[in-house]
Regions:
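Active-site-proximal alpha/beta segments of enzymes that process anionic O-linked groups
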Residues: 1-155, 205, 262-263
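Exoplasmic/lumenal regions adjacent to the first transmembrane segment
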Residues: 14, 23, 30, 270-304
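Short, flexible loop/turn elements at secondary-structure junctions
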Residues: 29, 36-39, 146-150, 183-187, ...
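Histidine-centered active-site microenvironments of extracellular/periplasmic hydrolases
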Residues: 49-53, 159, 172-177, 181-224, ...
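Fold-level signal for large, globular catalytic cores of enzyme and receptor domains
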Residues: 108, 167, 171-175
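Non-catalytic, well-ordered alpha-helical segments in soluble enzyme domains
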Residues: 216, 222-257
């Protein structure tokens, strides 16, 4: 998504290409805000700074010494990390360092009557609202990263439902902002996911949908919008989404600006594309064929 290509290699280093996307949008004149629900000094590391990964004791002298190293390792093209540091404070207050291994009593990650996800979503919406009201302020690219589906009890997903629904309802009323909801997988660490067949199907059921306001659709033009509608029924990748984002950043005020080969989802994806055509697909990825959700008898001739 961030780099527009797979960064997997033999080194297995944790890379996400975040600097590729943010540097481009800074050149396009955007302000960039990215925040997450992970804590930067946890052993699992941080999405915002994948090259920095070191666990230290909170509030220790060692923490003070390594904070400067963390800031140097963090993406220089970010204008703001939003509430990422608040994530650390909330997790520490609950006696944990990450949302992956929480006790059931803290599984909703609730702090002062609100969940951690609610804080991040509210901040993103508030930031966008202030940006939209002031025509003199640079447009914004905002990325909010939530690890909801990694919690073991399943409570956090249920708690986040209402907050995410409210956020999307508010974004649907925006006149100038394209909103993209994207997941990499369904809940995968709950007993439901691990022990039931329907739960195992959810693990491999990521979602993606895009909210395009009427005003933005007019600027994009008929060809781009037609391609978006068509591609809802095509095999698409996050690389296509990356191309779409870059195309938005490059757009002039003219909706008739050329649609290039790298325009991603703004160009019709081939109806004959298969998983074999996708470069850099991870070996543990599951590609579904048409009719995957139909149950077959073991004696069926369709079973090999």
């Amino acid at each position: 998504l961030m780099a527009g290509k797979s960064l997997q290699d033999e080194s297995q280093r944790r890379r996400n290409g975040i600097k590729v996307l943010t540097e481009k949008f800074k050149r396009f004149g955007y302000q960039v805000l990215m925040h997450e629900d992970l804590c930067w000094f946890d052993s699992r590391g941080s999405f915002l700074s994948p090259t920095y990964k070191k666990e230290v004791k909170p509030s220790s002298e060692e923490l003070k010494h390594i904070f400067e190293k963390y800031k140097q390792a963090t993406n220089p093209h970010l204008d703001s990390v939003g509430l990422s540091f608040l994530s650390c404070e909330i997790l520490l207050d609950l006696g944990i360092l990450n949302p992956f291994e929480v006790e059931n009593s803290h599984s909703s990650l609730c702090w002062d009557g609100r969940t951690l996800s609610e804080y991040l979503l509210f901040y993103a919406r508030r930031f966008l609202s202030l940006t939209e009201r002031n025509p003199e302020v640079a447009p914004a690219l905002i990325y909010t990263h939530l690890n909801t589906a990694h919690e073991t009890s399943g409570k956090r997903i249920r708690f986040d439902d209402s907050h995410l629904s409210k956020f999307l309802e508010e974004m649907a009323r925006s006149r100038t902002t394209i909103t993209i909801l994207l997941s990499t997988h369904g809940g995968k660490t709950t007993n439901y996911a691990l022990e039931t067949f329907p739960g195992s199907l959810e693990v491999y059921s990521p979602i993606m949908f895009i909210i395009v306001p009427d005003k933005v659709a007019q600027r994009l033009g008929k060809d781009r919008m037609d391609a978006l509608r068509l591609n809802q029924k095509r095999l698409v990748t996050v690389e296509d989404l990356h191309g779409m984002l870059i195309s938005v950043g490059e757009m002039t005020d003219s909706p008739s600006a050329a649609i290039s080969e790298t325009s991603g989802l703004f160009r019709p994806v081939s109806a004959t594309r298969t998983c074999a055509d996708i470069k850099g697909l991870y070996s543990d990825a599951m590609c579904r064929c048409q009719g995957w959700n139909k149950f077959l008898s073991p004696k069926s001739l369709d079973v090999i």
